[in-house]
Swiss-Prot record:
PANTHER family per the UniProt record, alphabetical: 50S RIBOSOMAL PROTEIN L31, CHLOROPLASTIC, LARGE RIBOSOMAL SUBUNIT PROTEIN BL31A
InterPro entries, per database record: Ribosomal_bL28/bL31-like_sf (IPR034704), Ribosomal_bL31 (IPR002150), Ribosomal_bL31_A (IPR027491), Ribosomal_bL31_sf (IPR042105)
Binding site for Zn(2+): 16, 18, 37, 40
Biological processes, Gene Ontology terms: translation
Bound cofactor: record note: Binds 1 zinc ion per subunit.
SUPFAM superfamilies the record matches: L28p-like
Keyword field: Metal-binding, Ribonucleoprotein, Ribosomal protein, RNA-binding, rRNA-binding, Zinc
Its job: Binds the 23S rRNA.
Keyword Lipid metabolism listed: no
Gene Ontology MF terms in the entry: metal ion binding; rRNA binding; structural constituent of ribosome
Cofactor(s) for this UniProt protein: Zn(2+)
Protein name stated in the entry: Large ribosomal subunit protein bL31
One cellular-component annotation, GO: ribosome
Length: 70
């Protein structure tokens, strides 16, 4: 590698909106803020909601199924 052309790789804190602080390394050089992390994201916390799309499909077919009939 060439000398003096690479950015500094320093340790920073990534702070989530829930208050969780994650220590990581980056070339940004300053602390960053996150919207979601593994502590508050619904997928990781088990609070994920499954949407019932079957009702939407049936409703669509009911409304527009007449146009597809021959």
């Amino acid at each position: 590698m060439k000398a003096d052309i690479h950015p500094n790789y320093v340790e920073i804190d990534a702070t989530c909106s829930c208050g969780n602080v994650i220590k990581t390394r980056s070339t940004i050089g300053k602390n960053i803020s996150l919207d979601v992390c593994s502590e508050c994201h619904p997928f990781y916390t088990g609070k994920q909601k499954v949407l019932d799309t079957g009702g939407r499909i049936d409703r669509f077919k009911q409304r527009f199924g007449v146009f597809g009939a021959k």
